[in-house]
Amino acid sequence: MNHIDDAEKIYLFEADDEWIEALCCTFENEGDNIEIIQGYVGDTIENGNLTIDSILEGQKVNYIKMDIEGYERSALTGARAVLEHNPEITCAICAYHCHGDSEWISSYLDELGFETAISHGYMSPDWSYESRLYAELRRGVVFGKKSLHSNTPGTYS
């Protein structure tokens, strides 16, 4: 919330009606630089889904933060043009919801010219008592920074 005034434009994507109402209340005094878009973000434009590319392609995008309960792969696939064509973009993508996401997300971003790093800590995708007994701990977040001058993926500072 501290950086809202620094942003030219913020797009918030949300599918849940209850969260739409909460977001509208939270940001009602922030002016026109915040746009709340209702819909599921994925890799196709059908059945109520939309893609980040369909909304933001051709626009300057500096930062993407994504925590969408295991749909990060699909949303990133649907954001390929935005990720490819914004030379100063950074991102923080949650990677603990699905097995293998940290590796997939890192590889995908590396392929698009990002330097990537994975958070040091671990998270459990399920906090129920039974799952804590047999938890698969996963890395929490993949960070990416577009690098025009680096040929060494995996070194984000």
Give, region by region, the residue ranges found by the protein language model:
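Phosphate/nucleotide-binding beta-alpha loop and adjacent structural elements of enzyme active sites
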Residues: 1-157
